[in-house]
Each structure stands twice: as C-alpha cells, then as structure tokens.
Amino acid sequence: MKRNEPHPSLDGRLRRLLWSMLLLVCVILVATLAILLLHNHQYSIVTANIVRASQFNQNFKEDVDLKMYYYVIDSSYGETLPLQEVDEAKTLGQELLSGTQDRQSRKAITSAINLCENLRERIVQITETDGYEARMELLESNIYILTELIQQYFYTYLYHEAGYLDSLQAALTARLWLELGLVAVGALILVIVLMRRS
C-alpha cells in the first residue's frame, strides 16, 4: 500500500525557492569578497615590491664607479671599497625576488643579484691586482659595465612589476564585472520566479 504524502503548499515551495535563490546570491557575494581580498593581497605585495625597488640607490652606478676610481688611482678618497653598496643591492634584490610573481620581473631581479655577486668578485680582484694600468683596465672593462647592468636590471624589474600591477588591476575589474553580472542575473531570475508565482 502506497502512502499518500501531502504535496507541499505553494507557500512552502515559494519559501524554499526564495531561500535557495538567497543562498545563491550569498554564495556569489562571498565569492566576490574572497576574490577582492585575494586581489587586494596580490596588489599590496606588488605595490610593496615597487616601493622597495624604488629604494634602490638611484646613484648606485655613480657611487660605486667613483669609489672604485678613487681606489684605483690610489686617492685618499678611495680608502673605502663600495662593498656595502653592492651587498645592499644584492640583499634588496633577494628580498624582492622572494615576493615577485611575474616571470619577467623575476628574471630581471635574478640577473641583478647574479651581477652583484660578480661585481663583488671583480672589486676584490682589483684589490689583488698590482699596477695602475691593470687596475684601470679591470675598472673600465668590469666595474663600469657591471654597475650599468645592475642599474638597468633594477629599472627593468620596476618596469615589469608596474606592468604586472596593471594586469592585476585589469583582472580584478573584469572579475568584479562578472560577479556583478552574476548577482544581477540571479536577482532577475528571483524576481521573475516570484512574479510568476504570485
């Protein structure tokens, strides 16, 4: 024998439909909030990297080159080697690398780090080299070129990070419009269903 179960009333079905649509809208809103928080986190990391990279000494090349020139010509101004400047640039590069997502930015900052290591070795090599001519040749063929490349790679890093920041902003805007569209469609469906049932 089959039991006759009572059919849910129209009012009960409408309430279930209303709750399910409300739940759908809430899920979309929570997803939108999660996406906003994720993008905000990524955006703040990239912004922090750009700010830190801009702390790189704008006069790095000139400072290191000048100190090395004074050292090579045995001037009283050349008593201190620019190893601290090189180490600071390398440390900054390593800090930036740890928080960088963009492939081109990572490539640029890795190159700068490697060149800082090479520059440090070349500075030490000059200290171990005898003779003004030999030291001057090392200065011109190594130090000047390496400092120029390091500075260029830091600027390249900044360029790519700014581009990555722009792409994050564009992706966030596109996702927000998509989420808003989904919420609008969900609300429209809810209104249509409720109007048909009334």
Please report, for each region that a protein language model flagged, where it lies by residue:
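Amphipathic alpha-helical segments and their boundaries
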Residues: 14-67, 105-108
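Extracytoplasmic
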Residues: 111-114, 118-174
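N-terminal membrane-sensor/transducer module of prokaryotic signaling receptors
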Residues: 1-11, 51, 55, 144, ...
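Selective recognition of signaling/oligomerization transmembrane alpha-helices
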Residues: 162-198
